[in-house]
């Protein structure tokens, strides 16, 4: 990951906020420990913290390119998986490249295609482009919402950043949460409504959205939407198509100029990805490094649940034997998990999933000692129906979020004066209804097919975003 942040002040010289920009950049240093950079002109200043993965020496940011009529400056966090194809297409249109990194491809794509460049990108990204002559800022976020991007309008301008904590470093962004923000945390958390930054003036660029900020306001719109289409393939064709898509996605994500490994829990998703990664690295003459986490005395105290019906270690060892990889174990105990609760929440900027977050926080720290990039099977359950609510009709047909049965328990944590202002059941129901009404369906869908399309969108916009927030 990398960190991006910046501000635009159309009515005054942005230089007066130089110290604020440096503070905003500093709190993002964990996202990008390798390099830092700052761009500044009269009305715009942007900063970047880089985790170098491709073209380590020449991929520095912010990155500026000029045409005969405009100067464009980019700050970018992400990875493009179709970089070679885009580079070739852009070169045919006259683009000249001086680096091998995807950052320059993003910038050249914007120079040639404008906002429509997002429709051509296969990847994960959040970026901003400042057009110096036009005095406008372009913001964009990937289709699924893997890379974060928040913003806040301030008097005469706008600030943006990869994380909420960076925005809060600016003096014009109040550290205020109103009753709507409280309801987001306590009634919908760890999820939150799309576009909501919880704090009173902070908003999120929604996934699959892009647009411009100008002196007259900010205008964002979707460039992609999940669409329902008739499925005409038979079972064998479907299996082959999914196999090729997964293989292609995994292979494209193995492009890196730094060490790369995989998470390995022994489950279907991580085992499949590790197998694919192993094949790619073997072809390069390299050995795959795999990583697993376990807990002290887990063999004594493990209790199965809907989410984890089996303990992992036996399956992990079976995959280790099959892959013949270089495996690394991280064993955590309860005091370690407890000590990491606050750092993990601070990294997320909002209350999260308690020990689920703290364990990942510690696990990733251990992984970084060996590799810079690691493939994970996270979100496979959301995309491929791995959760109980996809299969259990008693949960699936419930008129509400399948992972949240009642608001009564959560409402008891509100003080009386807040509880009187919020109808918890109505608030949660409205959030649920707003999501399922956006689900695209076909006229010929059966009730089950229609419900499964709704379930997919619920998972994409809510449960999955909770996991992606940790990216």
Name what the model sees in each region.
Residues 8, 43, 48, 155, ...:
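Glycine-rich active-site loop/lid subdomains used to bind and stabilize high-energy intermediates
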């Amino acid at each position: 990951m990398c960190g991006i942040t910046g501000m635009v002040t159309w009515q005054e010289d942005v230089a007066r906020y130089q110290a604020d920009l440096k503070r905003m950049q500093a709190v993002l240093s964990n996202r990008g420990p390798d390099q830092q950079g700052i761009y500044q002109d009269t009305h715009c200043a942007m900063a970047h913290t880089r985790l170098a993965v491709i073209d380590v020496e020449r991929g520095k940011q912010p990155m500026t390119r000029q045409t005969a009529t405009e100067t464009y400056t980019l700050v970018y966090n992400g990875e493009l998986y179709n970089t070679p194809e885009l580079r070739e297409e852009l070169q045919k249109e006259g683009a000249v490249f001086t680096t091998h990194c995807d950052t320059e491809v993003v910038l050249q794509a914007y120079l040639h295609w404008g906002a429509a460049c997002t429709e051509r990108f296969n990847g994960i990204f959040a970026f901003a482009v400042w057009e110096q002559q036009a005095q406008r800022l372009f913001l964009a976020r990937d289709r699924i919402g893997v890379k974060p991007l928040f913003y806040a309008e301030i008097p005469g301008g706008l600030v943006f950043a990869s994380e909420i904590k960076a925005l809060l470093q600016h003096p014009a962004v109040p550290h205020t949460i109103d009753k709507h923000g409280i309801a987001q945390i306590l009634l919908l958390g760890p999820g939150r409504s799309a576009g909501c930054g919880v704090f009173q003036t902070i908003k999120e660029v929604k996934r699959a959205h892009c647009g411009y900020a100008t002196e007259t306001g900010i205008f964002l719109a979707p460039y992609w939407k999940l669409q329902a289409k008739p499925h005409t393939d038979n079972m064998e064709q479907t299996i082959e198509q999914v196999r090729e898509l997964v293989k292609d996605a995994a292979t494209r994500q193995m492009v890196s100029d730094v060490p790369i490994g995989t998470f390995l829990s022994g489950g279907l998703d991580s085992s499949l990805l590790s197998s694919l990664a192993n094949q790619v690295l073997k072809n390069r003459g390299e050995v795959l490094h795999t990583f697993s986490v376990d807990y002290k005395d887990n063999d004594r105290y493990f209790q199965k649940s809907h989410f984890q019906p089996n303990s992992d270690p036996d399956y992990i060892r079976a995959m280790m034997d099959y892959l013949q990889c270089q495996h690394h174990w991280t064993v955590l105990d309860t005091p370690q998990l407890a000590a990491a609760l606050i750092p993990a929440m601070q990294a997320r900027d909002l209350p999260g999933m308690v020990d689920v977050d703290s364990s990942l926080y510690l696990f990733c720290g251990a992984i970084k000692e060996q590799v810079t990039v690691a493939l994970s099977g996270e979100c496979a359950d959301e995309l491929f129906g791995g959760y109980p609510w996809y299969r259990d009709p008693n949960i699936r047909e419930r008129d509400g979020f399948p992972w949240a049965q009642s608001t009564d328990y959560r409402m008891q944590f509100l003080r009386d004066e807040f509880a009187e202002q919020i109808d918890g059941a109505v608030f949660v129901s409205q959030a649920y209804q707003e999501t399922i009404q956006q689900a695209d369906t076909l006229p010929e869908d059966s009730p089950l097919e229609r419900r499964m399309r709704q379930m997919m969108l619920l998972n994409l916009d809510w449960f999955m975003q909770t996991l992606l927030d940790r990216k």
